Each structure stands twice: as C-alpha cells, then as structure tokens.
C-alpha cells in the first residue's frame, strides 16, 4: 500500500515532498537466513526480512494477483464493486509495465466450470475469480523495477521504525525509534502485517474507533503437486467454500502454492509458515 501510494502521488504531482519510512531493508538487501541456506530454523531476527522491508510481507510470496471482489478484503464496504475492479485492473497495468506476466487463469473457462460442477457434488463452492501467478522470483523483479522507478522521485528511509504518531500544528508528528521527530502535513499509514498490533495502539492513542476483522486459522498441508494438478493447472488457486453440517462453520481452501516451498515467517516472535512458488520450472519442487 505504501509503495503504490508513493507511486501514485509522484505520478499525480511530482513536486510533492514525500518521505517513506520503512522499518526493514531495501529490496536488494532483504535476505532470510533460512532461505539463504545459512540456518535450518528461525533465529528470531530483530527485524524479519521475510516480513519487513521494501515490498512488505508479500515481496517473497508466490505473487498471486487476483481480479475479484469475492475475497481478499472489504473494499466494497467503502467503494462500489465496479470501481474496485477498475482499481485492480489499474494496479495490474502498473505491474505489467514493470515486468509482470499477462497470462491469466480464470474460473470462466469450460474446464473451470466443469471443475466447479464437480465440486458442487461434494457441497464445495468455487469462488469466481481471475488470477495471475507472477512467481516468487518475478515478484521480486517487479518490486526491484518499481523501486528503481521511485528511488530518485521520493525519499526512502530504510531501517527506520516509527514509535508514536501524534496530531500537531495542523499535521502529524512522527517519533522514530532513534528519537528523531518528523513533521508532516499529511500522513498515510501502511503498517502491514508486522505492524498491525503497533498501529492498533497508535489508533487508540489518536482516539480512533476500531473494528475487529475475523481471524482465519489456517493449516498448511504439504502434498505432492500431482495430487492437485487437476485443479491448479486450470485455475492455479481454488477458493473452495464449505459449511459444516452441525454448526454451519465456514471453512475454505486458500493460498495454494503449486510446486512450491514451505517457508517460515516471524511476526514479533511468533513463528508461522507461508508458501513460495516460482515461475521458472527449474526452481520448482515436486
């Protein structure tokens, strides 16, 4: 969110003075010691390179880009669905201009519709969407290209953590971890996953009313790629919804990473797992 906000501000008004604060490192310096093969287990880095830095928590993901309002957030609570889809297409155009693929998977193909009918026989409901798989390595390349595009147009301050935000003199005063203070007229906060708890405290300090989103508890299961090839070759990732018979609880499949790799994440000392999947066949698992 912060990167694309900076991109759009510079596109609309290149004369603006924009400073982007990032607690992690630049896109070229980010490196998880597990992924680099230096260690086997998470060593609790003070700032997790998988979660923080230019590109955020998604920088090393498998790079799925979904064209849908059926899942992926609650933007339609604030913007009409047609406008949301226009914005999704607009962001995709930015990505394509910086090297993203134009190949798209869809639930509208004959194969996908046959898959949806078969799923209904088991009371599984396939959500409708188009999806691009950018690939972990291509995702990184796109972000590097965007960084090269922006680095001389606005100011990035890496390894810079904010501690407090306060209203002051018609703007905002941001206090940094090293004690420095920055004043700005307008402030856009994009704390990402790793900064969610911190930002909750900031909002309370500013007297903002908060709402709780639902929390999904997920289990990552590693299987041979051939088990789900009949699905992933057609739609790449299927969002299948099922409601349990006794209590009506909703469960779903999500975050498929065909031929992928399970990776560790560290969110303020809490270890979780994610999945990476490369576009290059030579980098895939089985």
What is each stretch, according to the model?
Residues 53-105:
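Dinucleotide-binding Rossmann-like beta1-alpha1 core, especially the glycine-rich loop
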Residues 1-72, 109-286:
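Residues forming the flavin
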